[in-house]
Amino acid sequence: MKREPISKEIQYQVFCRDNWHCRYCNDPVFFSPILKIFESISPGHEYYHPNGKSGKMIPLFANKFASVDHITPVTKGGENNLDNYVTSCWECNLKYGNKTHEAGKPQPNTIISSMNLKWDGLSSLYTKLLDKNDKWSDIINNS
């Protein structure tokens, strides 16, 4: 099976399902497009780099922006579907990469209960700070 691009709709669905927390380390994650807006509002503060490059972003943002990870990598027989996707901070995504559970990748933690949890990865700010609507804002506004 070939790894397919994960649509923005599916990414946002996974982030919301997992309550904007990394399923490996349980840390809250940031919605990376908001970091681009922060950088445009206050240039030179290293809030954002197009490739999330280490040393070019504030470590907190570089390590903890939200990404979707395959629990079982496609190259190891995993599928491209919601059951095989979890929210991962960029740090964990890089650390576990193409590993399987047998090779040291942990099983994803249980989804943190959303009860009394108001964290949204700063995604709600995205629609408020954006100059004009885009695909992400449409997804956020319609969810």
What residue ranges belong to the model's regions?
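The −1 position to Zn-ligating cysteines in a subset of zinc-ribbon hairpins
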Residues: 20-21, 67, 88
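Short, surface-exposed, polar/charged, turn-prone segments marking secondary-structure boundaries
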Residues: 44, 50-53, 94-103, 114-119
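Histidine-centered nuclease catalytic patch
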Residues: 29-85
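Short, low-complexity, intrinsically disordered N-terminal segments
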Residues: 18-20, 109-117
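Short Cys/His-centered divalent metal-binding micro-motifs
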Residues: 27-30, 85-108
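Short Fe-S-cluster ligation motifs
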Residues: 50-68, 73-74, 114-142
